């Protein structure tokens, strides 16, 4: 950057010097022009020759002040910081330290402590009473009187008695009776048990037809009324209601009344989706 500025300044200075020299040469050429000599007429009349003055130059070249050219300032070379090197001192060998001689400890035998004889108090033993076992009287088994079997009597044989025939009495002669004609037996058909009249099955009221999701909200509100997680039940019920166009009556069961679409709809995990 400094060199480029220096070169531009030198070029400008040389250019101004050249222009100034050219303007000086032009002014010198105008001054040194020869004066024209007119032909002299008759010597009788000589007009006075006017003294010609050199024309003054109408243009003076501008004088530019010469600025002294400063030599480029060179920066001193930057010396890198010198890291002080600490001289490495050789290791000083320390003389070996002599330890004082270790004296073996003097062993003193322990003085035996003489304990006085401990006087034990006389132990009193209570007399052990002699326990006599109770005399158990021998138990006599109960005497049962001997059972005397009754004497066996021989069976008495009775001679057979001859049957006594009753006296034969001749029945009185009855006049012949005319027998009525035999009627064939009448066959009564089996009586069928009378069944009580069965009441026709009561059909639950059919819910109104579902058209939009707004129609499913009141139906699913009654369906999920007793569910522990009502919000989850409502989302699943509204989806099933919108797809199958039906919600089973009641709060539980009766899925077959909405067909296989409602009963067989599964989640991604394979569980039943519709409540």
From Swiss-Prot:
Q: What's the protein name?
A: Gibberellin-regulated protein 14
| Species for this entry | Arabidopsis thaliana
Location of the region described as Disordered in the Swiss-Prot/TrEMBL record: 34-207
Q: In which tissues is it expressed?
A: Expressed in flower abscission zone, style, stamen filaments and lateral roots.
Functional note: Gibberellin-regulated protein that may function in hormonal controlled steps of development such as seed germination, flowering and seed maturation.
Print the keywords alphabetically: Disulfide bond, Gibberellin signaling pathway, Secreted, Signal
Q: Which Pfam families match?
A: GASA (PF02704)
Which positions carry the signal peptide feature in this UniProt record? 1-21
Q: Which PANTHER family match?
A: EXTENSIN, PROLINE-RICH PROTEIN (PTHR23201), GIBBERELLIN-REGULATED PROTEIN 14 (PTHR23201:SF53)
Give start-end positions of Pro residues composition bias: 36-207
A cellular-component GO term for this protein: plastid
PTM summary from the entry reads:
Six disulfide bonds may be present.
Location comes to: Secreted
């Amino acid at each position: 950057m400094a060199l480029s500025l220096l070169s531009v300044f030198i070029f400008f200075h040389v250019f101004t010097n050249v222009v100034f020299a050219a303007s000086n040469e032009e002014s010198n050429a105008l001054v040194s022009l020869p004066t024209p000599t007119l032909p002299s007429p008759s010597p009788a009349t000589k007009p006075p020759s006017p003294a010609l003055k050199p024309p003054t130059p109408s243009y003076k070249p501008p004088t530019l002040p010469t600025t002294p050219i400063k030599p480029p300032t060179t920066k001193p070379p930057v010396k890198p910081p010198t890291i002080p090197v600490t001289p490495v001192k050789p290791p000083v060998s320390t003389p070996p330290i002599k330890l004082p001689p270790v004296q073996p400890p003097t062993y003193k035998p322990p003085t035996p402590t003489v304990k006085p004889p401990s006087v034990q108090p006389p132990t009193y033993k209570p007399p052990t009473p002699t326990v006599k076992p109770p005399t158990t009287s021998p138990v006599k088994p109960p005497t049962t009187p001997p059972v005397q079997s009754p004497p066996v009597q021989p069976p008495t044989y009775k001679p057979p008695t001859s049957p006594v025939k009753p006296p034969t009495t001749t029945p009185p002669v009855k006049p012949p009776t005319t027998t009525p004609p035999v009627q064939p037996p009448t066959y009564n058909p089996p009586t069928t048990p009378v069944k009580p009249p069965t009441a026709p099955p009561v059909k639950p009221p059919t819910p109104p037809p579902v058209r939009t999701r707004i129609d499913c909200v009141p139906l699913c509100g009654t369906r999920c009324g007793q569910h522990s997680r009502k919000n989850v039940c409502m989302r699943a019920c509204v989806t099933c209601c919108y797809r199958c166009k039906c919600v089973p009556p009641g709060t539980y069961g009766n899925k077959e009344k909405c067909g296989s679409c409602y009963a067989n709809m599964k989640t991604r995990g394979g569980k039943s989706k519709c409540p």
